[in-house]
Every structure is written in C-alpha cells, then in structure tokens.
C-alpha cells in the first residue's frame, strides 16, 4: 500500500471511530425514526445531495437534525458505513434498497456498483423484477440489460412466479415482442392461461378479475403458429375460454383456420426470435482474401451457410481484434457452445512469455465476441473434442528437449473451470488425426504416427487405426481398422455411424507405398464393429487443414464446405458445397462458388439465430 492510500485509510478509520463515539458530529440524520449522528463534511464529500443541502443557505445548514423522508433506515445505515469505511456488503435482499437510496443521494459510484451487482447476479427468477425496477427508476442501461436477459431466457422465465405476478398490461406488452426466445408459440399460450389461473395469497376473486383480461391477452398470442391439437386441448383444460364469448370465438376461428388445410403454411406472421434459430455450417477462422466490400470489412468475419434455406451469413471470426492469430481446431459441445483453440495473435504473443494452446468460446448473448476460457500447455497437430462438460486435447506434437515429437498425451478440462488434467493416453502417439463424438464416446481415426515408439524416428507413417474412448472407464479401445491409411480427411457422425471422407492415403497398412488423393468414403458401424464403402466423392478431395474437418451434418444430411481438388494443386480452394443424402446415397452440389473466403480453419455445425449474424455484403467488389 502506498503512502497516499495509507494516509486516506487512516483518516477514514479515525473519522469512523469519532462517529461511533459521537465526537465532533455536527448533524443527526433521521430515517424511519432512527437517528444517525454524522459529520457534515463527510456527507458532503460523498454526496452532492448533502453538499447542496448544507451549503445552500436553507435551514438544513444550521439545523442539528435533518429528517430524510422516503429513506429506509437500513439502506441509509449501509451507505453511511460505506462513506466512513468503504465497506458495502451488497446482497440480493438489500441491493435494490441501497441503489434507490444512492440514486436519491446522487451517489453515482454506489449506484453503479449496485447495477453491476444486479447484472452479475441476474437470473430467470429476478430479471423481470429488475427490469421494471430499473425502468421505473430511469436506469436505462440496467433496464436494457434486464430486458435482453428476460427475452433471451423467456422460456425459463415462464416457469417462475415473477411472470404470473405481472399486471395485465405488463404481460400484454411483454407478449407483443418479436424478440422473445421461444421455439414454439404454445409456450406463450400456456403462460397466458397460467397467468389467468394464478391467485396470489387468499384472494378468491382474483381469477375472475384476471379472466376479464383474457380476450386482450389472447390477441397477443400468434394462434396460427399453435398446433390445432394443442388449441383443442387448451380449450378442454380451461373453462375460462368457454364461458367468455369473445375468447370462444377467437379460439374457434383459430382451430377452424388450422383445420381447413393442416399442411398449408400459416398465414404471414412474424416469427419470434427463438423460432428463427437454425442449424448452420460455420467455416471458422478464415483468411482475409476472397470477399471484398467497398464499405464493410469481411476480413474478420467467417462464412456461414444455412442448408435449409440456402442463406449465406457471416459470424465474427475468433481472429477478430487481438484474439487468436489462427484457429487450429474447434468443437460444438452438446450444449451448443462453440469452442475453438489456437494461438494468440502476434501483438498478444509479444506480451506473453510462453506460447500456449488458447481456448475461446463464442458469446452468443454478446453477439460478435469471443471470450477466453483457458490456456493449455502448447502442442500442435492435435484434435479437440468434448464430452459433457469436458474438453479434450488429444495427441499432436509437443516439445521435448527443444524438439517437437508426436505424443499420445490426452488432457481434459472442465468447462466449469479448474486446471487441465491428464487422462488416459492414446494407445500410440498420433498427430494430424480426426476425432468424432458419438453416443457419449470419442472416436479417433487416421493421422500420422512415428514408425516406432523411438522418439527420433520420422513421423512418416499414416494410420488406419480406429480408437474409441469411454469416459466412464477412462480407457481407449482399438476397433476395426479402416481400409485406407489416411490423413487430411473429414470425419462426421451421421445416423449412428461414422463417415470418413477423402484425404491423402494408401490402401491397407502404410508401409511406405505410394500415396494419393482419395475420393473414398468409408462408413463405420459401431454396433457390428465393421466398415463398409459409402458413395464415392465426385472427385478426390482434401480438407483445407491437415487435421480439421471441412464437413458437417445438418438435418440428417452430410455437407462438405469448400475443399482442395487433388494433391497436385491444392493451393486454390474450390468454393462449392457438396451434399449427401444418406437415403439416396448420391452426392450433389447444392451451392456453387459460395461467398466464402479463400481459406478457413475448421467447419462446425451450431444452432444459431440468423438475426445475430451479418448478411452478405451488398457492395461486393469483384477481384
């Protein structure tokens, strides 16, 4: 602690002792009948409200006692404690009272701390209360944060009691929003009916009073988006819909319209936010070239493709700003969290002593940003995957005595935090391999391995082995080998099987024979532990990176997003998107010359809302 800080702390401690002993106190604040002896100078130093009160020439300047109306005594006591000691013990029970008192006394620093506390501790049980509290107080930033939170988590908010305690006009305004993150309109109808039935306390006539607002609230529900069976079931379960003529008419008209042609699309209604989410192919970690816009830079945006609609969109690249210099691997967890790994950019690397594997996650709620999760001991040519709450770094090359050697090391990290921990190693050293998550297990295949376990051998042998990791036993098992030894292939899980596409390889075990670019598709069935041939690719192709996939599965179909044709000239990407329908067993080109960059690092599939992504540039410049 420096001398200046120590001096200030000593002064506060002495003033606080004098306040407790009522020495040299020159004013007594009274709130709710409780008296608080204080020093005018201290009050004026922390509160512009008191400074004006004690210097404006009015009677408070000379009065010994000042009564503060509409000021809770517990909140005032805590604010005085903060003035004299800097201690401010915020809790869920006292934070709103303290923030109101700080707002009235113009103590902006305390008010800001209260807002930060409420934002940090916001959840589905209190966000509605915080929103209306902040709106009534005029705290716009807090109100905006709370409103975004409750809209994003509206499905969970509906399960709580806060939403049932709203006034009719408040609920109606909330249900009018297009921005509610609900996947089905049935949940909106359900919360309306629960609100009508809700009777707080022992108020027997409350349900009748609430039923008067039912026609008005039903008009906020987008009934054409509700299934006809659900509409009929709701009418059977809720007599309030039957006894009110207007409600009955609204429901019968909705059922009749839906029954006329159940296959017809609903009449034009704007979908709510959560209804627009869709599975997207994300080509993450792009290079800068390939897309030029006159006014907007797409260098730091990554290409996305929506197979169901054919739309092209762009997501912020993890290379944006000073994040990752390049992306080496990525995975989408079972909870739809987009995680990538790689190295820091040059500017950040200059400020760090050690080079590490850096892990970043896409922040969907703060769209356009990536947040740092963890750092692991450096390796390259590894695979990244996830099971449950854990990330896994598998194999690759690690530094040993100033040289990089292929390793069998596997490390695990919990998304809840903590250190990286070693787990069961691979049965052999492996690099440039592929990993697939399926049915709660990890499958590692292909890649390159040393000729023997001697660390000075060249890593010039490709692998055709398939390894399975069981997290319950923490063991690796070797399964049936592939027909081809290979690397630079893509591997995905589809319909309970593993599809391995293309790559560079040779037939059988690699003993140094000729290698060539493959158009082969191999399919593994885990139930019978056997491989079968799949429909060959239209031409031999390679992934864009040595160990990262360029394929993904959406709605039961397999997609390949950009690739290199053949091994001779793989410096130019073919920007086509291939599709395989496993039932038809035929490859088709669904997008030619897609608006993607000249290269990217890894293809992932995630469920995202197009509203949070960028559209293609309207001012595209031909290169």
From Swiss-Prot:
Specify one Pfam family. Answer: BACK
User: InterPro entries per the record?
Assistant: BACK, BTB-kelch_protein, BTB/POZ_dom, Kelch-typ_b-propeller, Kelch_1, SKP1/BTB/POZ_sf
For this record, an example GO cellular component is:
cytoplasm
Which CDD domains is this protein grouped with?
A: BACK_KBTBD12
Q: Which residues form the BTB domain?
A: 25-92
Q: Where is the BACK domain?
A: 127-236
A single BP term in Gene Ontology = proteasome-mediated ubiquitin-dependent protein catabolic process
Q: What is the lineage of its organism?
A: Eukaryota, Metazoa, Chordata, Craniata, Vertebrata
Kelch repeat ranges, renumbered to this chain: 390-440, 441-496, 498-551, 557-607
Q: What is this protein called?
A: Kelch repeat and BTB domain-containing protein 12
Give the Gene Ontology MF terms in alphabetical order. Answer: ubiquitin-like ligase-substrate adaptor activity
Keywords, ordered alphabetically: Kelch repeat, Repeat
Q: Which domain of life is it from?
A: Eukaryota
